[in-house]
Amino acid sequence: MNKNTILTISKSIIIILILLAVVFALKAPAADLPVLNNDIKGEYVDSSGLPYFSEMDSYYNLRLTQDYADHGYVGDKMINGSEWDMHRYAPDGNKINYELGIVYLTNWLHDVANSVFGGNYSIKEVAFWTGAIISTLAVIPAYIFSRRLTNDLGAIVATLLIVLAPNYFAHTFPGFFDTDMFYYIFSLFFIFFFVETIRADNIIWKVVFAVLSILSIGLFSQSWTGYIFYIGLMGIFSIVYLIACYFFNIGDDKSDYPSKLSWLLHQDALLSIVILGIIGFAGLAVFKGIDGVFGIFGSLTGLLSLQSASRVVGGFPNVLVSVAEMQMPSLLGSGITSAFLANTNGVVNGIGGISILFAGLIVLYVLVSRSFKFRSVKDVVRTTGKPQKGNRLSAAKKIDNDRRFKLSLADLKFGGNNEILADKRLTVLYATLFVVWIVITALAVSRGSRFITTIVLPFALLTGIFVSFASDYVKNRLEDDRWLLVIVCLCGFLAALPLAAINNIFGIALFLVIIAVGVVAIYGIKPNAATKVPLKKYVVIAAIAIALVTPTVCGAYLTSETVVPGTSDSMWNAMQWINETQSNDTVITSWWDFGYLFEIAADKQVTFDGGSQTGSRAFWLGQAMTTDNLELSAGIFRMLDTTGERATEALVNITGDSGKSVHILIDILPKSSSDAQKTLVDKYNLNSQQAAYVVNFTHPENPRPVIFVASSDMLQKAGWWTYFGAWNFENQSSVNYNYYVPTSQVTVKPGQTGNLSILDSGGMDIRAVIERGTGNNTTAAHVEALNSATGEKLKLNDSEYNPLKASNLIVIEDGYLMKNESIKGAEDGNFTLFLMGNSNQYTPILMSNELENSMFTRLFLLGGAGQDVFTNVHSENGVMLYQVNFNNTVAGGASSSNSTA
């Protein structure tokens, strides 16, 4: 290894180390919660001083990691050799079928932290930082892959675009403990070594690269379910590449073979793919088992069907429609400047902004057009003999040249039509790879925003190549100083705009600095005749690189600076109260979002959580919270949390109709067991044996204790839980009902009038107008719809228009219900205005009329007054815990209950 080779390798290592430091430095501030004031920051920090995790999946991973550290396996029980989690999906729990790479790695890091560094770190402390540390290591494969295609600067740009990609960064900062951390590391290594297997001329190197590729995907398979996406991607690429080899005359001349099949069997590309296939089957069999390998195709089709949010499952609604990451993403965020920003608001924003989109598409066009130009050119025959000594390149130069993908912007007619010098086989190889990669990931993105992370990779790598193109073009073809200045000005604008979104002064300063440096370099410094490339061109190239990465860097900075944990002391303390006071067989029921947190903080089983949500459970929980019949709500909890889905399954087996089965259950759940059984026989024509069998599940003799959690976040989520609860089984559709909650309060003293915006959207400002008299019980209120720009009342055909008109008013002042009446002159409204006042501070909440007497409204907003089925046993700020009193229900043996509105 000569001096130049050592310098080349050393330079790459230094660049990687610098990039690692930069990326981690951008992630680390998230741990300090800088967006929160010190006076409220304490609400989001646990008793150990560590911020709460940022989302609920982290708590599931943390609990499994702690399980493994505690008793050597994940979950709570070993049943027939399988690990079972008894904290989930009451009453039966779940067999754990989860990639445990995150568990094994975190436990290993925990051991290293305490043994090597001599610390006394908890699993939770290590887990808090694991995502940020591991995801930062994606710098290594990103730089290696991109440096294979472009120059140093292009590789730096591509690496930053990948590792700081908005959707990836938003899931990998400190306090986000999920499997996303592995995503780019293994996918990049898998594809890189896959392509290197095809590129290699030596059979030994083909095998080595194939082994490394399969090792990467094998480790990926232990870390994230979505690994099968990349197996499918590269499988499709392999087929398309073989077709491209034939179409573009890659390899041996087709005329030398008697048939297409004979030609194909003798191609180097086929040999590479066969090697990958054989090693891949054997390698994945080691990681996933033979059945796992054969099940990959089914898993691929299942993954795609899973993303179809409108798909109805067994007659019940698909709960995935309520998962944000499963929604069809927007192309761009809102606002004129949005196209130039990097964030999670749209697909283009997710890849780094409009500049990255155009840069990537330009390079893709070059690759494809070059491939077609090459079609009539015979593939170069590779020789193994050494050139004459005087014509040999240094090892370092050969390594650098071999790593670069030699193309020029001349292909775009910028600066001339120079003869194409690139390698035909590589051009077709990478053209095929990136076309397939972008098409498949674009299709995936159409199935949900979670796949935006997949489309980042090809566009980032193509942008890295673009930097190399631009560098060559500026150095060799662009001589007009005026055009150099135009490029500098454009780049200054593109770089300053995202920084201005953080701080206007900084944005303007960056723009002026780039322009000033550009002007001085172009017009103020005379070129040195001894210098092959003048300084001004390096300044222009640097400006291009800065313009491309600044949106992504600024987006990462904003994300890190605005992190707010996914929970607070209120919810955690409420769960701790359950843990300390309730029996071990207690089930916690609520909407699924906080299920993972309930499991770890309360150490109790839950009805469902973020990984066990089903359409059936979503319907029943939504029905329980939407109905005005608290007997039905209690009956649903009694059934689900003690016998699970057995009653539904039994009736579906009898009737063959899930909708009819649900209708029957809604009818019998509020009744006594004897009346329920009689109803099944007399009204629904079941025989006595069938009726007794069903009632055994709907009315279990010893129902498990149930705590219902009502929290403020569920107000904003009402649109979803009412959607599921109001599901129409006949036409397979639904409607949703909402609460509209303001972001602040308004002060209204006696004798005064105040107003507060409840909703400001689409040019419409919905305001609650509150009028207070000077006597007792003289507070009145109504809702107005105003033009956001002018403040005037909205009109339609010269008549006042208010789509959120309130027809009913509920007033609670200082904890007492003062009014529950109709609003005069607004009888045609579809909403109820709930007004809560305390010490002259008023909070108006607008709700659909269908929610006025709903179980959730009665418990959370009205405090459970006027009923005895649910008892408020504990409260924290924004969190109320209700014990279900089954003995006070008709089904529980009471003659009657105070349950209906």
Predicted regions and their residues:
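Transmembrane alpha-helix segments characteristic
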Residues: 275, 358-445, 459-467, 482-496
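Perimembrane helix-loop-helix junctions
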Residues: 199, 217, 230-281, 510-511, ...
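Extracytoplasmic
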Residues: 17, 21-51, 58, 71, ...
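Membrane-embedded helix bundles of polyisoprenyl
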Residues: 79-84, 129-148, 153-242, 438-441, ...
